[in-house]
UniProtKB/Swiss-Prot annotation:
The modification Phosphothreonine is found at T540. It comes from Mus musculus. Belongs to the heat shock protein 70 family. The modification Phosphoserine is found at S76, S393, S415, S548, S757. This is Heat shock 70 kDa protein 4. The gene is Hspa4.
Length: 841
């Protein structure tokens, strides 16, 4: 079973796998551990990753990047509207109202959903992992920003399904970093001790996230998170791009933003310049040849000037840091360390701001680029039964408060209540109780829209079906279980109606009490102390109490009333049972039919990419063969081909080369396969003659050595040398005969081959020589390597017990003499022989 962690970044992605030796970040086909989050669409196939990145400028309209933030967002979303001007490709509104990506693929215009494009990238990362692990990859853990909303998380989950992955957990990026940090720490405080508080700061290309975590031995608890969803490395790039657009506009009279390719080139150069300025404080040049209208442009920038231009961005670094301390109610002195990751934290001014705020040196013990993917791989290993990992519990938080809203018959209007407050532990479940006579709907929403980086606070609607009143017409008790799961996704996971049945007393009067207690126990196990706070008030004000209290009160009241009855009167007995209720939901998520369709389409596109790759490989094989043979015909193959054959073959190679760049530019795979076979029919005999000429002398030499060795053994045997005197004369004669035959065969073939021209096929082939060597060895080797028979040494006669003299006058004992006499006259058994020896010992 594979264990894979995927860091699905805005600009680049990383894949880590768990192996017996630990966690390893794997490299792609370009030997690079960083895979660009980029997909390019062509007339015949898709390019994904590094291959797509190289087409950003040449195929700008059909190369998609920066699509991560479109997950779960409507086309009318203000964020999407703001992003349009930064995109080289077109985005469109899909029939669902969501954002789609418009490209030309396979010679026709296509609209892809964000989930489909992300699935393409995930498929590529999956392929990379499979090529390294040499086995299928299914289970994985994928990272998402901690500020992702329910809709965005569901969208990423859909993308993983389209890619054929089973996502065990959507893991918040800062939580993954915290896991990578904490699981290897051996000096964490014990569970009963005060936890170690560590702040994790992650500033990537598109966003800025901060979390504070409490560590104990084998335990990680996220206390609070804060973020700036638009502050990242690309904002600093934009400062440079805008500066040089303005400078080059004045200096060279160029309107750079009117030409998307020029803008993309400038963006790439500005990103390089920003990275250089992180290590150099001096003036650095920026030069681009043939930038626009065949004009070369150049400019300079230094770190000091750059930081001045970024003052407003740097001012946004502190607020999230202050926010996590306020939320967690911690002081700066309570923070043990501040760990920074993410590419943008390499900017010196950013590091300085963070360090100054906490008043301590920053910790850089984690790999800034790979910490997230390593944390995801560790989480996948923890969840996988295939790996034994040190126990480490992870408690995350809910980033935004979640509330429920419903129609209240008692209040004749809407009622609502906060189910999960901000920074509530996750994953977590709660059981809520409602009193209803008919089906009802719960609307889940984020209760602080002002803090939400998303225009719509609505999460979903859940309709509880088949709710009926009790047999006496009263409202039924409905238990609803709500949950924030490991992915950070909210749902109403189940609903059950409690039916009350009254009957006469049976032989087991205590069963009702026991059932009630079990019911209460189950409810307590599933919920926190505040679970019942959002139950709906029943029709009668007197019943406005917690569920458990109502049950206990009603049972107690019933007993009190029945106490004064005559003994012969039968007591009423209450039994309860639960009935599961169906739930219908309205979500920002793809339905099963669309998921199946997109999965099928992804499979077709993968197959098309594979076929196109095979076609290109076949074409490249023809081109490679043409160049190889043309060079070798005038080189090492020159002696092995006649003048006429060389001229004919050379002409054929030239014709093939011209065909490749004309009619053969775009042909099916089989045409290239046939063309290569046609060329090899002319070239292979020449290549074979060359190879035979190279290998034949070596094999003849080996055969000659074998013959000499066996002749030497025969001579030694005839000279009656001790080493071979044990051999049978008939066997040696057999060796001599085989050796002489092999020598005659070799001399004959050598003479014929020496008379043969190199331009024709050889008289004897290497396979024949190898067969002769094998034949000679199989006959002679067993005979000459026959070992000498072992000469056994003469056996020593066993010593008798009577040879030992009497000890301490024992010889005078008559009994002893009798025993000795008996030993001399009788024939003892094996056991009897050993007895005297044992006595003497």
């Amino acid at each position: 079973m594979s264990v894979v962690g995927i860091d699905l970044g805005f600009q680049s992605c990383y894949v880590a796998v768990a192996r017996a030796g630990g966690i390893e970040t794997i490299a792609n086909e370009y030997s690079d551990r960083c895979t660009p989050a980029c997909v390019s669409f062509g007339p015949k196939n898709r390019s994904i990753g590094a291959a797509a990145k190289s087409q950003v400028i040449s195929n700008a309209k059909n190369t998609v990047q920066g699509f991560k933030r479109f997950h779960g967002r409507a086309f009318s979303d203000p964020f999407v509207e703001a992003e349009k001007s930064n995109l080289a490709y077109d985005i469109v509104q899909l029939p669902t109202g969501l954002t789609g990506i418009k490209v030309t693929y396979m010679e026709e215009e296509r609209n892809f959903t964000t989930e489909q494009v992300t699935a393409m990238l995930l498929s590529k990362l999956k392929e990379t992992a499979e090529s390294v692990l040499k086995k299928p990859v299914v289970d994985c853990v994928v990272s998402v920003p901690s500020f992702y909303t329910d809709a965005e998380r569901r969208s990423v989950m859909d993308a993983t399904q389209i890619a054929g992955l089973n996502c065990l957990r959507l893991m918040n990026e800062t939580t993954a970093v915290a896991l990578a940090y904490g699981i290897y720490k051996q000096d964490l405080p014990a569970l009963e001790e005060k936890p170690r508080n560590v702040v994790f700061v992650d500033m990537g290309h598109s966003a800025y996230q901060v979390s504070v975590c409490a560590f104990n031995k084998g335990k990680l608890k996220v206390l609070a998170t804060a973020f700036d969803t638009t502050l990242g490395g690309r904002k600093f790039d934009e400062v440079l791009v805008n500066h040089f657009c303005e400078e080059f506009g004045k200096k060279y009279k160029l309107d750079i933003k009117s030409k998307i390719r020029a803008l993309l080139r400038l963006s790439q150069e500005c990103e390089k310049l920003k990275k250089l300025m992180s290590a150099n404080a001096s003036d650095l040049p920026l030069s681009i040849e043939c930038f626009m209208n065949d004009i070369d442009v150049s400019g300079t920038m230094n770190r000091g000037k750059f930081l001045e231009m970024c003052d407003d961005l740097l001012a946004r670094v502190e607020p999230p840091l202050r926010s996590v301390l306020e939320q967690s109610k911690l002081k700066k002195e309570d923070i043990y360390a501040v760990e920074i990751v993410g590419g943008a934290t390499r900017i010196p001014a950013v590091k300085e701001k963070i360090s100054k705020f906490f008043g301590k040196e920053l910790s850089t013990t984690l790999n800034a680029d790979e910490a997230v993917t390593r944390g995801c791989a560790l989480q996948c290993a923890i969840l996988s039964p295939a790996f034994k990992v040190r126990e480490f519990s992870i408690t995350d938080v809910v980033p935004y408060p979640i509330s429920l809203r419903w129609n209240s018959p008692a209040e004749e209007g809407l009622s609502d209540c906060e189910v999960f407050p901000k920074n509530h532990a996750a994953p977590f479940s709660k059981v809520l109780t409602f009193y209803r006579k008919e089906p009802f709907t719960l609307e889940a929403y984020y209760s602080s829209p002002q803090d939400l980086p998303y225009p719509d606070p609505a999460i979903a609607q859940f309709s509880v079906q088949k709710v009926t009143p009790q047999s006496d017409g009263s409202s039924s008790k409905v238990k609803v279980k709500v949950r924030v799961n490991v992915h950070g996704i909210f749902s109403v996971s189940s609903a059950a109606l409690v039916e009350v049945h009254k009957s006469e007393e049976s032989e087991e009067p205590m069963e009702t009490d026991q059932n009630a207690k079990e019911e209460e126990k189950m409810q307590v196990d599933q919920e926190e102390p505040h679970t019942e706070e959002q139950q709906q008030q029943p029709q009668t004000p007197a019943e406005n109490k917690a569920e458990s209290e109502e049950m206990e009160t009603s049972q107690a009241g019933s007993k009190d009333k029945k106490t004064d009855q005559p003994p012969q009167a039968k007591k009423a007995k209450v039994k309860t049972s639960t009935v599961d209720l169906p739930i219908e939901h309205t979500l920002w998520q793809l339905d099963r039919e669309m998921l199946a369709l997109y999965t099928e389409n992804e499979g077709k596109m993968i197959m098309q990419d594979k076929l196109e790759k095979e076609r290109n490989d076949a074409k490249n094989a023809v081109e490679e063969y043409v160049y190889e043979m043309r060079d070798k015909l005038s080189g090492e193959y020159e002696k092995f081909v006649s003048e006429d054959d060389r001229n004919t073959f050379t002409l054929k190679l030239e014709d093939t080369e011209n065909w490749l760049y004309e009619d053969g530019e775009d042909q099916p795979k089989q045409v290239y396969v046939d063309k290569l076979a046609e060329l090899k029919s002319l070239g292979q005999p020449i290549k074979t003659r060359f190879q035979e000429s190279e290998e034949r002398p070596k094999l003849f030499e080996e055969l000659g050595k074998q013959i000499q060795q066996y002749m030497k053994v025969i001579s030694s045997f005839k000279n009656k040398e001790d080493q071979y005197e044990h051999l049978d004369a008939a066997d040696v004669t057999k060796v001599e005969k085989s050796t002489n035959e092999a020598m005659e065969w070799m001399n004959s073939k050598l003479n014929l081959q020496n008379k043969q021209s190199l331009t024709v096929d050889p008289v004897v082939k290497t396979k024949e020589i190898e067969a002769k060597i094998k034949e000679l060895t199989s006959i002679c080797s067993p005979i000459i390597s026959k070992p000498k028979p072992k000469v056994e040494p003469p056996k020593e006669e066993p010593k008798h017990a009577e040879q030992n003299g009497p000890v301490d006058g024992q010889g005078d004992n008559p009994g002893s003499q009798a025993a000795e006499h008996g030993a001399d006259t009788a024939v003892p058994s094996d056991g009897d022989k050993k007895l005297p020896e044992m006595d003497i010992d």
